[in-house]
Amino acid sequence: MAAFSLDLLAQLPEAYQAFGPLIDILPIIPVFFLLLAFVWQASVGFR
């Protein structure tokens, strides 16, 4: 069982290599929510 889990951990980085650019973008998503809130308030006139 231990050998299987070590083998699985060794394969995961290669399996997720294609998602590298997505992982780089993920931390920026909360900033987009902040900008969305500002644009929404601007569209309703900051009530």
From Swiss-Prot:
InterPro entries: PSII_PsbK, PSII_PsbK_sf
SUPFAM superfamilies xrefs: Photosystem II reaction center protein K, PsbK
One Pfam family named in its UniProt record: PsbK
Example of a GO biological process term: photosynthesis
TM region(s), chain numbering: 19-39
Keyword Thylakoid among record annotations: yes
CC terms in the record's Gene Ontology section: photosystem II reaction center; plasma membrane-derived thylakoid membrane
Subcellular location: Cellular thylakoid membrane
Residue numbers covered by the propeptide annotation in the UniProt entry: 1-10
Main localization category: membrane
Keywords: Membrane, Photosynthesis, Photosystem II, Reaction center, Thylakoid, Transmembrane, Transmembrane helix
Topology term for the membrane: Single-pass membrane protein
PANTHER family assigned to the protein according to its UniProt record, in alphabetical order: PHOTOSYSTEM II REACTION CENTER PROTEIN K (PTHR35325:SF1), PTHR35325
Functional description taken from the UniProt entry: One of the components of the core complex of photosystem II (PSII). PSII is a light-driven water:plastoquinone oxidoreductase that uses light energy to abstract electrons from H(2)O, generating O(2) and a proton gradient subsequently used for ATP formation. It consists of a core antenna complex that captures photons, and an electron transfer chain that converts photonic excitation into a charge separation.
Subunit composition and interactions: PSII is composed of 1 copy each of membrane proteins PsbA, PsbB, PsbC, PsbD, PsbE, PsbF, PsbH, PsbI, PsbJ, PsbK, PsbL, PsbM, PsbT, PsbX, PsbY, PsbZ, Psb30/Ycf12, peripheral proteins PsbO, CyanoQ (PsbQ), PsbU, PsbV and a large number of cofactors. It forms dimeric complexes.
Family listed: Belongs to the PsbK family.
Full protein name: Photosystem II reaction center protein K
